[in-house]
A protein has these predicted regions:
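N-terminal active-site segment of His-dependent metallophosphoesterases
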Residues: 1-60
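Short acidic, glycine-rich surface-loop motifs adjacent to enzyme active sites
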Residues: 46, 159-177
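Short, solvent-exposed aromatic-acidic interface loops
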Residues: 288-297
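Active-site glycine-centered loops adjacent to acidic/histidine catalytic or metal-binding residues
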Residues: 11, 43-44, 85-86, 170, ...
């Protein structure tokens, strides 16, 4: 059986000045040494906001800085895929420069696998690799756009013969920091369950968490991958912390992973995190890694 890995890095947020957080540069150097088969940028590489008034030239500069930061991966022969996050996609300038930032995404990936027909990279698209079907979807807020839903439904139906189906989007099905849209959760979650998707990986919330969600047609594992720069992160919501935390420590119930909190807060102590997914045939294992003392080590205690 084929054994390989891929990684997801999300929520880097290049500074408005165009500077890349130094922590992310360190993450990329260490990640290149791990030699995953490919890396997915899980959205929010940039720092756009709805009314920022930033022009295309400045947004282009953000993307140039971000792409430069990925150089160690490409130098190691590790291709990079991407999806948009909300901060990459608010305004016309954000949207146009996001698409322009990934002109050769499909051709860069051909050495690993061809992207399947019918997708629209770098928004929603998919590929098959060694019996694993991976779908990347455009989900930048708690609203499933009809065209994304229609594409995903067809994409997963066509992948019914895959040994394993995984989906990556920016916004999680269930929020661990604030309000969950039940409509979004049920629309997307039901599609994933109907398509027998084993796991849905998301960014957006700048923390590490996992849970199993149940829908009428099955269960889906929800994986929050964290922020790969750690410039800021969010506290777990009060109800989650009451159920899973005691003092300055918490435990992810699904996995049993114990983690530290910043004293007196609901913030996870490990701020800079990435997700590595190990594939073994039709099975997969999720590894959350955090940056400590400039090294990638397992998240938690």
């Amino acid at each position: 059986m084929a054994q390989w890995s891929f990684a997801i890095v999300a929520d880097v947020h290049v500074f408005s000045s165009g500077q890349v957080p130094t922590s992310f540069s360190t993450v990329i150097a260490r990640l290149a040494a791990l030699a995953p088969r490919f890396v997915v940028v899980g959205g929010d590489a940039t720092v756009g906001n709805p009314d920022d008034g930033v022009g295309a030239d400045k947004v282009r500069g953000w993307w140039q800085s971000f792409q430069q930061a990925l150089t160690p991966l490409r130098a190691a022969g590790i291709p990079v895929l991407a999806i948009a996050g909300n901060h990459d996609y608010y305004t016309a300038a954000h949207r146009s420069e996001y698409s322009a930032a990934w002109p050769t995404l499909d051709t860069d990936f051909t050495g690993v696998a061809p992207l399947l027909d019918g997708g629209s990279p770098p928004l929603s698209y998919s590929f098959d690799l060694d019996g694993v079907h991976v779908s990347l979807i455009h989900a930048v807020d708690q609203k499933l756009e009809p065209e994304v839903a229609a594409w995903l439904r067809e994409d997963l139906a066509a992948a019914a013969g895959a040994g394993l189906r995984l989906v990556i989007g920016h916004v999680p099905l269930v929020s661990m920091i604030g309000h969950t849209s039940e409509t979004f959760k049920n629309q997307l979650g039901s599609l994933l369950a109907q398509g027998q998707v084993a796991a849905y990986f998301s960014g957006h919330e700048h923390l590490v968490w996992e849970q199993e969600l149940t829908f009428a047609d099955g269960t889906v594992r929800q994986v929050h991958v964290g922020t790969a720069s750690g410039t800021y992160h969010y506290p777990l919501n009060q109800s989650t912390c009451q159920a899973a935390c005691q003092g300055d420590h918490g435990t992810i119930p699904l996995t049993g992973t114990r983690f530290a909190l910043r004293p007196g807060t609901r913030l996870q102590a490990d701020k800079v995190n990435i997700c590595v997914v190990d594939i073994d045939g039709a099975d997969f294992t999720v590894r959350h890694l955090c940056l400590r003392e400039d090294q990638l080590v397992p998240f938690g205690e």
